[in-house]
């Protein structure tokens, strides 16, 4: 499927007309040069937390809040440049020249500036143009006006939406007219863009932003390749999702050694302890290059299942059977009391603490007394299982979808809290308030330790959930919030359309 390119009478599209008017106010009214708008939405992950870096699939959706770029090609031919203006005055205007020889734009990740994210989208688009079309010249210069309503820093992937809209604009303006821009190619192109500013993401955000479909969630797979498959919510159900920000920010530099970084180490060590126990070899994949819990599952079945010595191909029923087996092995093999460093060294087959440290503890700073391998592995396998059970609900289209999907979300929150320990008191409080006031399922979304929560509601109950959260959480904990800040903290959205280009 290709990104929709929609011929548009801007005078009959109020939101787009407003954006064009603001562009004209910023620049000028020269209509002789090509003008177009690219749009990409934010996303929220409905289920499947902290399992993407274990190579298991996740279930996000695109939200209605989006980011748009109003773009106009410049007439300059000798010195092409990009001029960036942001509707938000907190982001100063930027202008930079484009390499005349067609070489890739340079990015300095040590400099924290919003234009670096534009350059990320530009750079990967340049690479795509060179690889697919043998594009050699400099890309077209443009004047660009940026506007969006995705709260930044709220865990809804505003940066990914920005990059997707940028890459779409660069590719569209540098290929022959009428050339389709395929969604899967744009997804794979942008999936690695943020790596250029030091963000080690895996592609879920970009897949959801680009491939979103109204009324659908997206089953995003990472193996054998990045792929997004839409699953439709039951048509006759008035579904709404409420996304509430705890307004708690976890400083990753300070808390990483005992939170996120440590979880990456624990799931990797768990995979290797299981591999040693069952005599299988893991591929050099994952964040530490030492294999993942998905690798262990595939290696286990390759060795022990005589009927099918193949890695899992994503088929739902097979995945459910295999994940249930993995949960059984975790219960039988790993100790709920945790592992000291010495014990982990022995079970991983390392010869010394120094060897274990070199293999597992040097990529990221970590601190621990005991490694909770049982809890982390149980969360990963059970969360991956919940994703597949959610897909079964989509396929059945059952009348009690609210209750059953909500139950999976609640189980996910329980697992994130008790097994992965990535919740926090504020998240727990928001979920409790929401469930008492009309939410069918409430859970954290994103990395956790603060950040956002997501709640499954009906259109009949979503307003009561919002009112309860306003009165019982925000007004009590953050009485200084302005009306605008409160509006950013609570977002109501239905599953939305992904990237679009208007010309």
Swiss-Prot record:
GO biological process: galactose metabolic process
Protein name: Galactokinase
Binding site for ATP: 153, 155, 157-158, 250-252
NCBIfam families (UniProt xref): gal_kin (TIGR00131)
This protein's encoding gene: GAL1
PROSITE patterns: GALACTOKINASE (PS00106), GHMP_KINASES_ATP (PS00627)
Record flagged with keyword Transmembrane: no
Native organism taxonomy: Eukaryota, Fungi, Dikarya, Ascomycota, Saccharomycotina
EC number: 2.7.1.6
Active-site annotation: 205 (proton acceptor)
């Amino acid at each position: 499927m290709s990104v929709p390119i929609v011929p548009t009478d801007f005078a009959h599209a109020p939101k787009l007309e407003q954006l064009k008017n603001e562009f004209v106010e910023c620049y000028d009214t020269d209509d002789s040069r090509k003008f177009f708008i690219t749009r990409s939405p934010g996303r929220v992950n409905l289920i499947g937390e902290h399992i993407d870096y274990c190579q298991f699939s996740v279930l996000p959706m695109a939200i209605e809040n989006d980011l748009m770029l109003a773009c106009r090609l410049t007439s300059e031919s000798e010195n092409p440049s990009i001029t960036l203006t942001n509707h938000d005055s907190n982001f100063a205007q930027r202008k930079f020249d484009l390499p005349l020889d067609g070489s890739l734009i340079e990015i300095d990740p040590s400099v924290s500036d919003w234009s670096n994210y534009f350059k990320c989208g530009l750079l990967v688009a340049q690479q795509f143009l060179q690889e697919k079309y043998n594009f050699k010249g400099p890309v077209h210069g443009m004047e660009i006006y940026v506007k969006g309503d995705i709260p930044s820093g709220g865990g809804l992937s505003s940066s990914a939406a920005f990059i997707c809209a940028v890459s779409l604009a660069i590719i569209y303006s540098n290929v022959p007219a009428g050339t389709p821009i395929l969604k899967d190619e744009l997804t794979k192109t942008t999936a690695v863009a943020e790596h250029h500013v030091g963000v080690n993401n895996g592609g879920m955000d970009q897949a959801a932003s680009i491939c979103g479909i109204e009324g659908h969630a997206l089953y995003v797979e990472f193996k054998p390749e990045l792929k997004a498959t839409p699953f439709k919510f039951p048509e006759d159900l008035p579904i709404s999702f409420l996304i509430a920000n705890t307004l708690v920010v976890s400083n990753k530099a300070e808390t990483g050694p005992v939170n996120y970084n440590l979880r990456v180490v624990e799931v990797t060590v768990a995979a290797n302890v299981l591999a040693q126990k069952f005599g299988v070899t893991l591929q050099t994949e994952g964040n530490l290059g030492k294999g993942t819990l998905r690798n262990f599952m595939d290696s286990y079945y390759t060795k022990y299942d005589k009927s099918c010595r193949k890695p899992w191909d994503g088929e739902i029923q097979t995945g459910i059977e295999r994940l249930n087996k993995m949960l059984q092995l975790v219960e039988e093999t790993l100790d709920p009391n945790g592992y000291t460093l010495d014990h982990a060294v022995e079970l991983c087959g390392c010869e010394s603490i120094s060897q274990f440290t070199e293999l597992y503890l040097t990529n990221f700073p970590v601190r621990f007394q005991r490694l909770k391998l049982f809890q982390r592995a149980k969360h990963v396998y059970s969360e991956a299982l919940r994703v597949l059970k959610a897909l079964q609900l989509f396929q059945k289209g059952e009348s009690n979808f609210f209750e059953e999907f909500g139950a999976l979300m609640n189980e996910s929150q329980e697992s994130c809290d008790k097994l992965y320990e990535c919740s926090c008191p504020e998240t727990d409080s928001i979920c409790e308030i929401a469930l008492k006031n009309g939410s069918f399922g409430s859970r954290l979304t994103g990395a956790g330790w603060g950040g956002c929560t997501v709640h499954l509601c009906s259109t009949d109950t979503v307003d009561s959930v919002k009112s309860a959260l306003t009165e019982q959480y925000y007004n009590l904990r953050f009485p200084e919030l302005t009306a605008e800040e409160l509006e950013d903290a609570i977002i109501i959205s239905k599953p939305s359309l992904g990237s679009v280009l208007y010309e």
